[in-house]
Amino acid sequence: MIVFLDLDGTLTNTAHEWFKPFKDGIQEIDLNNVPLFNGAKQFVEDLQKEGHRPIILSDSHPKYVNKIAQQIFQIPAISLTDKPNAEKTLNYINSNPDIQQLFSDKDNFIIVGDSWLDVEIGRRLNIRTVLTQFYKASSIEERDGIGQDWKPIKMGATYYAKSFDDVKKIIQNPNKELLAIEAIFQNENSDNMVRFLYRNYNGEFTAFRCLARQDDGECDKFARADKYYQIDNPERSHDFISKLAQGVSNYLSRVEKFPQYQWDYLTYVSDKKTTSPPNKMKEIFDLVNSNFNKIKLFEWSEDVEGSLRNKPNYKARREFIAKYLKTIDGIDLNGKSVIVIDDQFTSSATANEISQQLRNKGVKNILFVALFYLILPIESKACPQCGKSLKIKIKRKDGNRFYSCLSPQFGGQGCGYIENIN
């Protein structure tokens, strides 16, 4: 496997602004002053022993990057890559015939890095990405997203790693280490999730977790927007629903392994009576296998009008849910802990409103689990007819992808050009 490794913040603990003059090539770096993350050299050596080819992929100046790559790690490097622009990386791939040949199968490649830029360039190359979390940022960098939590997560890395051992585990068995629902569609069982949010309330907490990515635009092949849209397909199969439920069950088995947290109820966000197909979430929920006590806690008002999907922003979505979706009365929730399952996490309006309703009922701990979460869009191809950016769309009926130059009829400003993706 070709393993592209970010340098600063991934192999070297040099994300701090003190290192900027060296990374920019203004000052010469003394290698004695380059702090390596514990185990970095051994990690690179282990990759090579196992037959992998590590290559440093860095935005920093070649004078800085090459010195570290050659004298500390003894591996090749690409510098001044201009992440997330993939052009220079593609030029490197295409200029090396053996690497170019491997690139025909994107499973031969992976990118490891600590910022959303590493994730985005990986998505543009359609290869898997590992977002590392090896240090706590001392300041926020707007461009790299260093010190921010939400943007790297919303960019949609394939994997997350807190140590080099985590990265090695991913490289050794990449399909097994996918998110729970992404893994199930590769015939693997995984209990992995995205830790999207955690809020502490004086010893009580609310946590949001997501089990698969809903891609928008370029991405690695393991993100499953096609499967999300399949939920709404009236012709969806029982096998498909069973796989979704199994992915949820696999994650809940992980939750059950923490006896310090006692969960009283497992519930779900029910569907409106007008939803098609009807009771889609209940059908999934009924197939989820867990030891938690299942219960229905939410229902929509009979007079609900409109659709949450058509609301333009977080505020409008939150107001819609607060008006029409209610926690059922008559069930004592005071001091209880509740797990809630929903199909999608986008703006977080549903998760936040439901969490607030449960807290108003006295609920102690809340675990909100979304089957899919919508990641940030990436557009990288221009329309051959009008030059505007093409969007990758998915046919809800069969899950096939296609490029679309969205016309005004569908909320865009393009010419309507369509191109199938093989």
State each model region's role.
Residues E28-I55, A86-N91, Q260-Y265, V269:
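Short, acidic loop-to-helix structural element flanking the phosphoryl-transfer center
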Residues T10, A40-A69, A77-K83, G122:
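Substrate-recognition element of Asp-dependent hydrolases with the DxDx(T/V) motif
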Residues V112-Y159:
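Acidic, Mg2+-coordinating phosphoryl-transfer loop and its flanking beta/alpha structural elements
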Residues N175-Q262, E302-G330:
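Active-site-facing substrate-recognition patch
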Residues M1-K49:
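Active-site neighborhood of HAD-like aspartate-dependent phosphohydrolases
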Residues R124-V130, Y135, G306-K381:
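PRPP/pyrophosphate-binding module of the type I phosphoribosyltransferase fold
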Residues E379-N422:
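Basic, low-complexity terminal or inter-domain segments flanking catalytic cores
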Residues P62-I110, W116, E120, K315-R317:
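Substrate-recognition "cap/lid" segment bordering the active-site pocket of phosphatases
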